[in-house]
Amino acid sequence: DRALYYSRGFQIDNYMVDGIPTYFESRWNLGDALSDMALFERVEVVRGATGLMTGTGNPSAAINMVRKHATSREFKGDVSAEYGSWNKERYVADLQSPLTEDGKIRARIVGGYQNNDSWLDRYNSEKTFFSGIVDADLGDLTMLSAGYEYQRIDVNSPTWGGLPRWNTDGSSNSYDRARSTAPDWAYNDKEINKVFMTLKQRFADTWQATLNATHSEVEFDSKMMYVDAYVNKADGMLVGPYSNYGPRFDYVGGTGWNSGKRKVDALDLFADGSYELFGRQHNLMFGGSYSKQNNRYISSWANIFPDEIGSFYNFNGNFPQTDWSPQSLAQDDTTHMKSLYAATRVTLADPLHLILGARYTNWRVDTLTYSMEKNHTTPYAGLVFDINDNWSTYASYTSIFQPQNDRDSSGKYLAPITGNNYELGLKSDWMNSRLTTTLAIFRIEQDNVAQSTGTPIPGSNGETAYKAVDGTVSKGVEFELNGAITDNWQLTFGATRYIAEDNEGNAVNPNLPRSTVKMFTSYRLPVMPELTVGGGVNWQNRVYTDTVTPYGTFRAEQGSYALVDLFTRYQVTKNFSLQGNVNNLFDKTYDTNVEGSIVYGAPRNFSITGTYQF
């Protein structure tokens, strides 16, 4: 349930909802990447450094989830039911209705329930979600939206990490994909509450001001267990990775009772429009934002030693629950971020456009033991040349500013990552944007990048210490094609190739694929227009990680592989449709965590969904 996404060799840690960012720490699993997509109209992905948009963030990408709004002036909606592998059942209702006779005030509610087991032993997940929003036209030029979102996710027997990868002799283990280290008593529960508001004011025909505001609270409570060890092939006994540091570090895993809350208050006010200068039309956008994010987490930990588990060959989840000590404060910090930003698109000539922008960010974090404050100005410059009505080329530059949550051997947080992002590209647009293509070449330069020392922070519960490294470079090329090839044929195709190295020429994050190819297509049969068939292929190249162990340097490796998915949809009546999906058609066994433990991806699975629209 700890879903992480990557782009251009780095983790995506900027998640936005309606343009308002939330920065999250991957070590605390608050479900940021698991929000139910039924609540959103679409998901936008902007690749590369996005400091002009968000103020901070990895030079990977930013994900913006756009909420559904009440757009209909008459009652309409849809309901769906889905059933699938591992006892999956899912029900969703999406309803819109006018609240006034003229439709100027409208409401939309989306609600759903999902329950499913897993290919993993003992696992079960139950999810409830709801969103309600009211959109009101206060006049010809003014619109107000206000809403509330709720999600509850309860998971029983979730895994925390994976299965021990190596034996003490350096050989690799393999397991049944159902094997899990989660005990019967483990759980991970999350509750999300958000209120939000948007006010839009148009001025004449060319200018608009937008105010976005949100307050969110995410709470979680979990008791889980992890195993981090090597297996003695002779008897299945586990050996800890830090045993050479002395008896106190001879643990082979641990249990954790973690609870906490993250609160975010954020405002974003901006205006955008066009202006005339030197006889040409240009565009301008400017604004300011403020966010306050408080993270408070408490925990209770216990180390697990080899005799407590016994032979791992016999482990089946019946590990006794820890006699928990009272929870103590693990983290309490508040991050304030204030930004002012502006950007303009200047038409230098009919085919040539200059884009200039900057964002000033004041970032401050206050913890229990110290405070850190940084001021940073993120410049952006781009040049777009329209070759003809269909083709254009561009070049862009921006800087990188990324606060970090990794700590050094003294326990202090590392200074923010800084750097530069360069990009060249070629775009095409056909049939009024029904079909688009993009080819991009990028180069990312970073300093202060966290690199693991492989040793724990003294006095911590085994938390790994990191050091800051300068001179990290990622460079590569991306290609995308999206849209309608014909009236009946839709195609999405993307390919990426990059390399990422540190200042000594060593690979950075070699556990992430350097080459990927993704394709998804659908085709509506002309002879039977009620029937649509399609599928997709995701391919990635070989990945690896070298890990220094007490027994030498071991390499974890996953060869290149492709996953194939299929679907078919049949429009039974004007209002009712059925869709069947098959994921991992060829039942490929693959490892999603090419590090010290093994985490298998989902085996072949099926689902069928019925949708009724009215």
Residue spans for each PLM region:
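Gram-negative outer-membrane beta-barrel transporters
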Residues: 349-351, 467-548, 586-589, 609-613
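Structural signature of Gram-negative outer-membrane beta-barrels, strongest in the C-terminal barrel
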Residues: 135-137, 262-264, 280-293, 329-446, ...
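Periplasmic plug
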Residues: 4-49
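Membrane-embedded beta-barrel scaffold of Gram-negative outer-membrane proteins
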Residues: 200-202, 208-214, 218-224, 393, ...
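Outer-membrane beta-barrel translocator/receptor signature
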Residues: 23-24, 39-41, 47, 52-132, ...
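C-terminal beta-signal and adjacent terminal beta-strands/loops
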Residues: 445, 539-548, 566-614
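Face-selective signature of the C-terminal outer-membrane beta-barrel domain
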Residues: 195-218, 251-368
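Acidic/polar loop-and-plug regions of large Gram-negative outer-membrane beta-barrel proteins
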Residues: 114-118, 131-202, 217-262, 307-333, ...
